[in-house]
Amino acid sequence: WDYTAVQDMTLADMVVDGEPKKVIMQAPKNGFYYVIDRSNGDLLRAHPYVQTNWASHVDMETGRPVENKEMDYSKRAQWILPGPLGGHDWQAMSFDESKGIVYIPAQDFPFLYSLDAEFKATGLYKRNPGTFNLGLDLKNSTFLATEYADEALTAKGYLKAFDPLTGEELWNVDHVHYWNSGVVATAGGLVFQGDGLGYLSAYNTDNGEKLWTYNTYISMLAPPITYEIDGEQYVVILAGTGGPENFVGYTNDTAAYKYGNFGKLLGFKLDSKVVLEAPDVLDKTLPEQ
């Protein structure tokens, strides 16, 4: 599956089932949001936070996801959610302890899983440099994707406000592209996120309403941060993208595709007079032969 659990973890004090708990929380790739008592390791909650079809739920006794037998790809190819990029990847989420709500840079990125013929015959899988090594039939992935096109699921990214105790989605903001930046929530009721198209935006944490946006002309992956110096509040982001976009190529609606992936450190404050000028669009026309 390639469902790593290296995504950021959040420490918090929460009241769970009427009792105060010191918890550790994570939204790993596999699509389930885990709340764990960090004093003893007890699993307290494990709700799906994105579309998840590879498993039905997490067994609260064992802590293991219960696989969906209908999505077994050993006999036929299956479109799986989440795919190997996960429902949440490197991009940092943010927790508002006063509300008990987490803001997740989530994504639905389906992937067509089919076992490699040699692997099925021998149980061995030869490493393929420069690509995913999941034991899958990637050599025939284009053919398989065409064959199973009528079953394909749509990739999308979104900012989600999620209650980790109830599993309820309070709101979500759909993005044009699936690969967007991490987020930061503030005590003033704002959550900031950059997107693949190059826009850094501020949303109302209560309802997801977009309150401010700025075109940076740079696709973003890292989370914004905020801090105060001499009474002035700043929002700063290391703008630039990476991960699968660098791996498989930039898609044509992203800022990285249009202008290039030139990383910059961008800082914002109220009443700033600095204006970021639009860069030239890259010329991608093929030279005449």
Question: Which residue ranges define each predicted feature?
Answer:
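Beta-sheet-rich non-transmembrane sensory/scaffold domains
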Residues: 1-289
